[in-house]
Structure formats: C-alpha cells, structure tokens
C-alpha cells in the first residue's frame, strides 16, 4: 500500500508573493495553479491512501472549492474530511477558519470512518479511516510540545 501524507497549507503557495502586501497575507487567498500542481504531483505518485493536512473545504479563500473533493475526484478516490477544530470551538463560527480541515483520500474500498477529538489543544481532530485490513488515523499535532505530548499519549492508548 502506498500512503502519502501532505500538508498542502490550503494550497496558498510559498515564496515572497505569499507575504504581500503584508506578512501572512497569502493565507487569505488561494491559487488554483497551486492546487492543480499539488493534484498532478499526487497523481504522479499513484497513491492508495492520501492524508491531507490543512485543506480548505470551500471558504472564500479557495473560491468556494472543496480542495479535498477536487483532488479526490481527480484521483478517482473516496474522500472524507472534517473541520480540524472541536465541534464546540469558537473557530467553528469564524469565516474561512471554519472551513479549515484535514482529509483522507482512499482508493481501496472504505469500510468506515469516524471523527474523534482530543480533549485539549486547538487542532483537536482525529480522523479514523477503516480499510479492509487496517485502520489508519490522521492527526495534525500541535507545535506546542506540552499539547503534542498529551495528544501523542492519547493516541497510544487506543
């Protein structure tokens, strides 16, 4: 099985233009060419399973395009995605932010999917994807070492 994990950073691109007109401005706009290049790159790898971190599921930033669905359709894969913040998080109310998610794309037959959430941290989402012979978990751990340690310990107890 070929598994690819890719933090696509909302297909916002990189480089000097990302920081114009102010630092970080690139997070407020997406570029369809970037998403197309990411999609072509993933196609070239011919993956069975793709974990996507930092995708946009249809905010104004992505031109209302669900990036997970668009990539999955291009690959001929099944997709499942969910907002990366807890269901009761204030982030669920904020435009653009409420469309920030993580996703799985899968070529093999999917037996089931579940969404779990850590009890602490900002990025709480855990996606569980059940395939025929294996269950795979997708987690975007915090940069905070204390939160990441707690989250990692939670994962190892499953």
Predicted region positions:
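N-terminal, active-site-proximal structural segment of metallo-dependent hydrolase catalytic domains
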Residues: 1-74, 81-89
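Short, basic/glycine-rich phosphate-binding loops at helix/coil junctions
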Residues: 11-21, 101-104, 133-137
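Short secondary-structure boundary/capping elements
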Residues: 30-34, 121, 147
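Short acidic/glycine-rich loop or secondary-structure boundary segments that cap or lie
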Residues: 13-14, 89, 113, 145-147
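Structured beta-strand-rich core segments of catalytic domains in phosphoester-bond hydrolases
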Residues: 54-133
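A generic local structural motif
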Residues: 36-38, 91, 125, 153-155
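Active-site beta-loop-alpha substructure in enzyme catalytic cores
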Residues: 134-158
């Amino acid at each position: 099985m070929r598994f690819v994990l890719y933090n696509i950073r909302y297909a916002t691109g990189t480089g000097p233009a990302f920081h114009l007109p102010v630092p970080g401005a690139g997070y407020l706009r997406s570029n369809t060419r970037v998403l197309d290049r990411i999609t072509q790159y993933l196609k070239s790898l011919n993956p069975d399973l793709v974990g996507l971190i930092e995708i946009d599921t249809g905010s104004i930033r992505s031109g209302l395009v669900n990036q997970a669905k668009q990539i999955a359709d291009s690959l001929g894969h099944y997709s499942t995605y969910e907002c990366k913040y807890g269901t009761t998080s204030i982030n669920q109310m904020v435009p653009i932010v409420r469309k920030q998610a993580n996703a799985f794309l899968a070529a093999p037959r999917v037996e089931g999917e579940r969404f779990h959430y850590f009890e602490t941290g900002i990025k709480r989402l855990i996606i569980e994807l059940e395939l025929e012979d294996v269950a795979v978990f997708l987690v975007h751990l915090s940069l905070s070492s204390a939160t990441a340690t707690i989250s990692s310990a939670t994962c190892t107890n499953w």
